Structures are given as C-alpha cells and as structure tokens.
Amino acid sequence: MMGAFYIGCGLSLAAAGLAPNLTTMAVAMFALGMFAAIYHPVGMAMLIEATNARGRSLAFNGVCGNLGVALAAGISAALATWVSWRAAFYVPAVLFVLTGIVYLWVTPYDRHQAKSRVSSPAVPLTPRLAVMLFGLFIVIALSAGLTFNVLTIALPKIVDERLSRDLPLLFVGGIATTVLVCGALAQLSVGRLVEWVPPHVIFAIVTGIGFLGNLWAAYAGGTALLVALAIAVAAIYGQVTVNDMIMARYTADAWRGRVYAVRYFLLFISAGVAIGMISLLHESGGFALVLGVNAVIALLLFITTLALVAMIISVEGRQRKPQPAE
C-alpha cells in the first residue's frame, strides 16, 4: 500500500503537470487526493507497530509533516516563478516515483506478517467500553480538527488585523511562522514527555492549556495576543502526538489502520468546515468572535478529554487489580 502511495502520487502529479485543460487537471488532482489518503491510515499504523519509542517517533513524524506543508507553498511558488507552473508538478512527481521504487526495493514483503497481526489491543476492552471510547475519539477528532484548522488557517490574517493593518506582508508572515514553530517545538517536547508521564494525563493538561490559550487570544491584543496564540498553537500541535499514542494503546494492530482512517477522515472534513466557519464568524463579529467560538470548541475538546481520562483511569485500574487465586 505504501508503494501505491508513493508511485500513485507521483503519476498523479505528472498527469497534472501534463494536463491540457482544467477537466484533466481536476481528474489528476482527484487521483492525487485518493493516493495521498493512503498515508495516514497505513503509514501511521506501520510506524506505531515498528517503533519502540512511540512518543518520539510520532512527534518527529508529525513535525516533518507540518514542515512539508509549510515548505510546499514556497517551493511550488519558486518552481512556478523560475521554471514554469508545470515544473511545480514534475519535480515532486519524480521524487515520489523514485522514492516509491527505492521503498519497494528495500522493504521486505510482509503479507504473511500482516496476517499474523494481533487482533486484541494492549489493554483489552469490553464491547461497551470500546464503543464509548470510539465515540469519545470521534468527538475529540472533530473538535481538535476544528480548533487546529481555525488557528492555522486564520493565523496570518489574525496577526495582520489584530496587531496592525500597516504591517509589511513579510513581517506578518514571519510572525505567523514563529507562532507555528512554537507548535512544532511543543510537539517534539510532548513526544519526549509521554515516555515518562502517562499519555492521558498529558492529554488533559495540553487540551486544558489549549482552551486557556484560545480564550486569552479572543480578548488579547498586541504582544499578549502573540503569546496567547503561541500557547494555543503549541497545545493543539502537542495534543496530536498524545492522541495518536492513546489510540495506539487501545487499538489492536489489526484494526489500527481502520481507526486511523476514520480519525483522519474526520480531521480532513473539519478542515473544510473550518474555512466556512471562519468566513461566517468573521463577517458577523471579526476575529474576536472567531477566536471566541474556537475557545468554546477547545472547551468541548477539554471536557471530552477529561471524560476519556476518567474512562482510561478506570480501565487501567481494573487491569492492574490483582486477580484472586483459584
């Protein structure tokens, strides 16, 4: 599947670069989206299964992904400016296909290993608890996705509008990038921390901090706004690693890919909702209203996380309880 991800994305990008009209371009981009969607449910499950240091591995993987998103626009713009817009598709197409060939060459075929994957999680759950846990994860995925996307999408405009309307574009971009770097550093720090502190405890702390950061940002201005945004972004980035860790612990290897597929489907859906939400709320009350509503969503995330933590404490305590001798 990962080979299909690499080579499929490469061929789709090449087709987009060769597209003679908008219809062909749309078909190529649709194919690119289909192949790109393979990564999160398959790649994340493989990473978790293979690593012995889940926290650090997930954090590093997340930072690399965010770095790729941050660099993509600049690299594409440079290629389009200095070469042509088609080069912005051809260059990553070649890199994808070559990476896919190398991946298939150096990675052993593991079909038989896949059939022997464990069908029960590290911590067994009753069917009722499993359904409740999955329901909480759905609410967490939607609320975290909305909070994340509202902040990251609106961040440059928030800085521009709330600080000053006369700031140079380069300065605004620099401030927004600095705030996002705080998120990346938090992600790495949390990845280290979860190897020493129970992930569910960190999850509750991080989401609580995220709520406070969003609430502060809704009322702050000037330097205080930048600090509040940095706290909110750091928290929402940091919770991603802990969320993945908890899902890995309570999901069997054989089902982990499906669970991650549902989670990232909800996250991608929330991205589209966030764009419409920002537009509607900003038109009604500016970014004060946008950040205020985002704080309410962050509060929902925090409350749901507390419910998840309470369930985990109960399950873990029951598992550690010594069984009576027969």
Show the residue positions of the predicted features.
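A late C-terminal transmembrane helix in Major Facilitator Superfamily
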Residues: Y250, A254-G285
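Cytoplasmic helix-loop-helix junction between adjacent transmembrane helices
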Residues: A28-G65
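Helix-breaking motifs and short loop linkers at transmembrane-helix boundaries and internal kinks
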Residues: L18-T23, N52, Y219-G221
